[in-house]
A protein has these predicted regions:
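Accessory carbohydrate-recognition regions in carbohydrate-active enzymes
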Residues: 1-142
């Protein structure tokens, strides 16, 4: 089941679900999370819209007052990138909409190696993807 949501913490107990209330940065939005299990895992297929300088690991800053959430929907403004981001999901699909302040500087990080709690032995076994066109990416992740 898809649980599309932000990953604000990557290592340690506070990263168990990917999101921690005390955090003010978003590393990525990932498609799968465990909830209520007492242990962290998943955080599969990380996506982060960003702008500005290319970097290996862009990190978004956000303000709690600019978050909105309801079942199946999450929205937040990525302050340092000037991007309004909205997520929604069904059982098997996650959809992200990014509205960039600067329409000429649009970038999207797709990280198939992202995982929560790598220090607990969690790892990506393999992945592959291909760009079909300028709006479609298909692939596998395991």
């Amino acid at each position: 089941m898809v649980q599309f949501s932000p990953d604000t913490h990557l290592i340690g107990w506070d990263a168990s679900s990917g999101y921690h209330e005390s955090d003010s940065v978003i590393y990525a939005f990932s498609l799968t999370h465990l909830s209520g299990t007492g242990i962290g895992d998943l955080g599969d297929v990380a996506i982060l819209p960003y702008s500005g300088a290319d970097t290996l690991r862009p990190i978004a800053q956000f303000d709690k007052t600019e978050e909105a959430a309801s079942p199946g929907y999450y929205s937040v403004r990525l302050k340092n990138f000037g991007i309004q981001t909205e997520l929604t999901s069904t059982d098997r699909v996650g959809l992200l909409r990014a509205t960039y302040a600067d329409s000429t500087d649009r970038k999207l990080l797709l990280d198939l190696g992202h995982i929560l709690q790598p220090n607990w032995g969690h790892k990506v076994v393999g992945n592959d993807f291909r760009l079909v066109n300028d709006s479609t990416i298909v692939g596998t992740y395991y």
